[in-house]
């Protein structure tokens, strides 16, 4: 769906569109593209979007298209350059490690169609938090692992084992390729699906870089699965979503002990209160 929206209104509209079930967004200077599975598109959704536009004083004209699955990352992955984030150097497999970063922890990530390259603020925010909460031998749960970058980073910092899950079929292949490429495949188990595929508890660290609606749904399970001394790291959130997210966390006995922002994005480190 393509909306004629000025850039200043993108962030508040993304929050409201997310609540309607849209799962991905692409921003351009004078328009906003929003994506949802075709099976979920209804006339009621169209009318709700038009109402949002009218309330912002905008024309309620929208353009809707059905698109076929495509490996969008193939268009730009050849342009990916190594990037340093905290103690990490993130690079695609076809780039050598620049000499200036020889002492960094290398995360070799080929993205394909999965999310998590280090080029998005939400990924960088969690990577920067990780060194403060990964204990030697820690058990890690990575929700919505995407490329597997957060799992790989945690294991390279000294975590002992990880379970990584994702509902996206592309992630199943991509994450496992990246686990093998980074030499951590023997310490991580990938599972296809959502939180129901993880009956285990007592994780030292839970990682989730997903949009707010899904995070709110997963928080009760995160509270049950994290150790009393463990950490829950959340990202994929806009600054405007902070208060709602903290209220939801508090309702599940989770409190913030560290927060970080970059541009419009916000991330938080939570611990159990009881």
Regions found by a protein language model. Give the residues of each.
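N-terminal auxiliary segments of SAM/dcSAM-dependent transferases
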Residues: 1-100
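Short beta-strand micro-motifs in enzyme catalytic cores
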Residues: 1, 32, 105, 266-268
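SAM-dependent Rossmann-like transferase core, predominantly class I methyltransferases
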Residues: 70-136
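Conserved SAM/SAH cofactor-binding pocket of Class I
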Residues: 113, 117-202
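S-adenosylmethionine
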Residues: 133, 167-274
């Amino acid at each position: 769906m393509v909306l004629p929206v000025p850039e200043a209104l993108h962030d508040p509209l993304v929050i409201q569109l997310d609540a309607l079930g849209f799962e991905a967004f692409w921003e351009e200077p004078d328009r906003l593209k929003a994506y949802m599975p075709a099976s979920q598109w209804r006339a009621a959704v169209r009318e709700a979007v038009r109402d949002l536009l009218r309330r912002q004083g905008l024309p309620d004209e929208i353009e809707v298209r059905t698109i076929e699955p495509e490996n969008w990352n193939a268009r730009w992955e050849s342009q990916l350059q190594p990037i340093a984030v905290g103690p990490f150097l993130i690079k695609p497999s076809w780039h050598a490690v620049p000499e200036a970063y020889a002492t960094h922890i290398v995360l070799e990530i080929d993205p394909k169609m999965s999310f998590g390259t280090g080029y998005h603020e939400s990924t960088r925010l969690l990577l920067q938090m990780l060194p403060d909460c990964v204990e030697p031998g820690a058990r890690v749960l990575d929700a919505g692992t995407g490329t597997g970058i957060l799992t790989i980073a945690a294991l390279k910092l000294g975590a002992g084992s990880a379970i990584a899950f994702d509902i996206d079929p592309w992630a199943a292949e991509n994450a496992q390729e990246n686990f093998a490429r980074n030499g951590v495949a023997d310490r991580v188990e990938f599972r296809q699906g959502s939180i129901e595929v993880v009956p285990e508890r007592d994780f030292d660290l839970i990682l989730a870089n997903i949009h707010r609606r899904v995070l709110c749904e997963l928080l009760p399970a995160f509270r049950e699965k994290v150790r009393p001394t463990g950490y829950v790291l959340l990202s994929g959130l806009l600054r405007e979503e902070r208060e709602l997210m903290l209220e939801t966390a508090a309702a599940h006995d989770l409190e913030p002990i560290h927060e970080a922002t970059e541009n419009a994005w916000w991330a938080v480190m939570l611990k159990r209160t009881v």
